[in-house]
Structure formats: structure tokens, C-alpha cells
Design a protein with these regions (language model features):
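TPR repeat positional signature
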Residues: 44, 95-98, 220, 224-227, ...
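Alpha-helical support elements that line or immediately flank enzyme active sites
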Residues: 40-70, 286-298, 347-359
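Aromatic/His-enriched, Gly/Pro-containing loop or helix-boundary segments
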Residues: 71-114
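Short amphipathic alpha-helical coiled-coil/interface segments
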Residues: 118-122, 243-258, 367-375
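C-terminal GPI-anchoring signal of eukaryotic secretory precursors
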Residues: 428-448
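Extended glycan-interaction surfaces of carbohydrate-active proteins
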Residues: 1-38, 62-68, 74-77, 81, ...
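Inter-helical turn/loop segments and adjacent helix faces that build the functional surface
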Residues: 101-113, 230-245, 356-362
Length: 463
């Protein structure tokens, strides 16, 4: 598995950069798979989960060094490993990646040598992607959004973007659409009705993409936990003034989760519409990100918050599907919508519920139920097609997802990493099919998928 996805960038890229679109990095990388032949930023968090479980600490350290080098060169981590990606990023999971590595192999010198670069990446999002929002009481909150102020088509999808914009009336409208499409790519959710704004609804087409008018709940939840993690890192280094600084930033962001994103009536967090000055009350799996980050907001009981959230999920009917939780309930033909399910979103929801097991009695069992559904759909797809896919269809167990701008891709880095993490956590309880009573069903499912994933010898430290 990892051998198939491993790449080493040729030194010719370093020696003659004008002849190549790749970004040179010194250490080996893991690519997602399929058509994606370069590394990508946020994918790597879940890939690293799997690499660490495979004992590949040195490979992970090398990947982190690559990302840190890019922060030094570009001020942030680019979307992916191509020169044309350097003007946009992706969801900032570098600090959580670093924390995963530190949790497996704490390296004080590595942390000390790179803490300034970790902070530099945080400040890119904290400053360069910041907007101000007022809550109902007139208090100002600093929030972040995906916003790429580059007004030409995406280089990797130039033809599609150019064609989409052709019937717009003015050059300014075309340029703004290009900004929105690039901002959607920066979000990682390219594309979804989540970013459609049409008369203050999410009904529309790709031309209604308006990412820069939306404040994403998951991005701000992620920056909250990033601030908490920086505080932890500074404390480990004995840098107590910096620890207190990031304690304050984290607390401000935690308050914002309550004041801007939390909907007390529905019992969930939502994206915020800057123009309408209101929350966008639609189901997207991004709404659940705060249960993974732990940034629930300081108000009220966490147990009560979890109770309301589980009720919300039941009321929305998103727990009824055998193939996992859908990305949204909007059947738009976009890949980050119904009926698709994505490994990173399943992981965030499952792990968030699992971490809440001591907060609410139902959270751990729901976490297990979702994990079991996800592993079953991975296993069935692997049995039938001998591949792991980037996305799956929640309505048919084992079926690959579809929609969007390209065919579903096999590989697949983050799907592999999530499966390995869930097998590690729940492997002793999983069953291959609902109601299965065969001997040792947990062993057959867990070992079957794990052996498939490990069939190319992931335990070998190949780099």
C-alpha cells in the first residue's frame, strides 16, 4: 500500500526548477493515489495516522520537514506539490500532524527547532485569512475563512473554469468567480452546495459558488485546537509567556464557537453567512468538527451539548445509511454532497464521539456504530475491487462514490489511514456483516481488511 503511494522527487526538479511544475522537497512523500501524483496538504494528516500505525516514524518526520520547509519558503503550506498551488493552501492540519508525531515519538529538539515555523503557519491563517464578525450583542469576533485573491482560472482546471465563466456579463464577474473557485479548492471541499449562495440559500449551481461570503465552522474549530496545541508545545519547551499568549488566543476562539457558530435551537454548529449575518442552517458533516477539536464553546454543559447534537443527527436522518454518514443531504452531483462519504469526515465524527464517551453515555456506542459501518463499506469494496477509494456511496455498502469534476480515484492515502486507525481502536468488536454469527467474525473482518492494506509490506521502513 504505502510502497505504491511513495514518491521521491528527483533532484533534477531542484537543479532545473523552470522545467518542472513539481515543488522540490528533499524527503520522500506519500501521494493520495490515482490521478493525484503529487502530495497534497490536508490529505497528509490521515495518511500520517496510518504511517505511524505502520511504524514509519522516520517517513512521517521527513514529510513534516517537507511541509515546514514550504512554510519557510511560502509562509504557509501550499495546496499541493505543484508550483501552481503555491498561491493557495488547504485546511491547516500541519500542527495536528506534528502533534500526532510527537504523541508517537516525542522529540524535544525537533519541536524546539521548528516551533517558530509552526507558529508562522498558524499566523498566516490567523492574520491573512481573517475577517471580523459581530455577534448579537455587538461583540466583535475575529474569524477565518478560505479566501484566495487570485482572479484567474485554476491552472489545473483552466478549461473548465474558463468555460463556466463565459456567459457571465462582465469581466469583474468572471474574475470574482475565479476567486471563488480557487477559494473552494483551498477549502478541500471542491465542490459542494455548502459554498453555493443563491438568495441566501444553498440552492444553485457552480456559478453560485461564493466561498468568500461564508465563515466555515470547521476551519475556525481547527484554528482553535491549533492554538491549544501551540500552547501545549510552548509549555513543553518552557516558554511560558508564549504559552499564556496562545491560551488567550485559544480561549477567544472557543468563545467564538459559541457566539457565532453554535445554534442553540438546532443543537449543532453551522457555517456563518457574512452577507446575511446569520448561520447557514443546513446539514454538512463539517458541522461536527468541534466535537473532534473539543472547541465546544465555554457556555453550558458539554454533556447537554452532546445530547443535543446526537438528537440533531437522529432528526436529520443521517445515521440511517449503511455505508456511513453522508457529507450532506443535498443531492447536487457535486462530490462533497450526498450520497458521498469521505474518510476524513467519518474519522473526525467518529473520533469526536469517541472522545466524548465520558461526557455522554450514547457517544461511544454511536462512535462504534459509525466505525463499523465505515469499515464494512471499505472491506466490501476491497473484496470486490481490490482497491480502497477516496470516497464511497452511503446508500450501497462498498460502492465507490461519484460526482464532481473527475472519476473516483483508487489508492487511497486518507482512506487507508482512517481504516487503520479505526481497526486499531475498534478491531476487537467489529463484525463483517450486520447480525453475523459466524465464528470469530471480528477476527475475519479486522484481519481481512488489515491484511489487504498490509499486503505490500507497510511495516518495512522503505524510505
Amino acid at each position: 500500500m504505502w510502497k505504491k503511494l511513495g514518491r521521491k522527487i528527483s533532484t533534477t526538479v531542484k537543479d532545473d526548477p523552470e522545467k518542472h511544475s513539481q515543488i522540490y522537497v528533499p524527503n520522500p512523500v506519500i501521494v493520495p493515489g490515482g490521478r493525484f501524483r503529487e502530495f497534497y496538504y490536508w490529505d497528509s494528516y490521515w495518511t500520517i495516522e496510518g504511517l505511524l500505525l505502520s511504524g514509519m516514524n522516520q517517513t512521517v518526520k521527513g514529510m513534516l520537514e517537507n511541509f515546514l520547509m514550504m512554510v519557510k519558503d511560502y509562509g504557509m503550506v501550499p495546496n499541493g506539490g505543484r508550483i501552481y498551488y503555491t498561491r493557495r493552501s488547504q485546511p491547516p492540519y500541519l500542527i495536528p500532524m506534528f502533534k500526532l508525531y510527537m504523541d508517537h515519538h516525542f522529540d524535544q529538539d525537533f519541536l524546539r527547532d521548528n516551533i517558530e515555523l509552526l507558529e508562522k503557519e498558524f499566523l498566516f491563517w490567523h492574520n491573512e485569512r481573517q475577517v471580523k464578525v459581530q455577534d448579537r450583542k455587538g461583540m466583535t469576533h475575529h474569524v477565518a475563512q478560505y479566501r484566495v485573491n487570485v482572479s484567474d482560472p485554476r491552472p489545473e482546471s483552466y478549461r473548465e473554469d474558463y468555460a463556466l465563466a463565459q456567459d457571465l456579463a462582465t469581466e469583474e464577474e468572471k474574475q470574482q468567480l475565479y476567486v471563488e473557485l480557487k477559494s473552494g479548492a483551498e477549502s478541500g471541499w471542491d465542490y459542494s452546495t455548502r459554498w453555493f449562495v443563491n438568495n441566501e440559500t444553498n440552492n444553485g449551481t457552480m456559478k453560485d459558488t461564493n466561498v468568500t461570503s461564508i465563515v466555515p465552522v470547521d476551519l475556525n474549530s481547527l484554528l482553535c485546537v491549533n492554538a491549544q496545541t501551540l500552547s501545549y508545545f510552548y509549555n513543553r519547551l518552557g516558554m511560558h509567556d508564549k504559552k499564556r499568549e496562545y491560551d488567550r488566543i485559544a480561549e477567544e476562539k472557543n468563545i467564538t464557537m459559541s457566539k457565532i457558530f453554535w445554534d442553540q435551537t438546532d443543537g449543532v454548529w453551522y457555517d456563518y453567512d457574512l452577507n446575511a449575518k446569520s448561520r447557514r442552517r443546513y446539514f454538512y458533516m463539517s458541522n461536527l468538527h468541534p466535537i473532534w477539536s473539543g472547541c465546544y464553546g465555554p457556555e453550558g454543559s458539554r454533556a447537554r451539548t452532546m445530547e443535543k447534537l446526537i438528537k440533531y443527527l437522529n432528526n436529520k436522518g443521517v445515521l440511517k445509511y449503511d455505508g456511513g454518514m453522508p457529507t450532506s443531504l443535498e443531492d447536487s452531483g457535486q462530490q462533497w454532497d450526498f450520497p458521498n462519504a469521505w474518510a476524513p469526515l467519518q474519522h473526525l465524527a467518529i473520533m469526536g464521539l469517541y472522545e466524548a464517551r465520558n461526557i455522554h453515555h450514547a457517544a461511544e456506542e454511536l462512535s462504534f456504530e459509525l466505525a463499523e459501518k465505515w469499515i464494512r463499506t471499505n472491506w466490501k469494496g476491497y473484496q470486490e475491487l481490490h482497491a480502497m477509494f477516496e470516497k464511497y456511496n452511503v446508500t450501497v455498502v462498498g460502492k465507490a462514490g461519484g460526482g464532481g469534476e473527475y472519476e473516483v480515484q483508487p489508492g487511497f492515502g486518507w482512506s487507508n489511514g482512517v481504516a487503520m486507525r479505526l481497526l486499531e481502536l475498534f478491531g476487537d468488536r467489529l463484525t463483517p456483516t450486520e447480525g453475523n454469527s459466524a465464528a470469530s467474525p471480528t477476527l475475519s473482518l479486522a484481519l481481512g481488511l488489515l491484511m489487504g492494506l498490509l499486503s505490500l509490506g507497510v511495516r518495512s521502513q522503505f524510505f
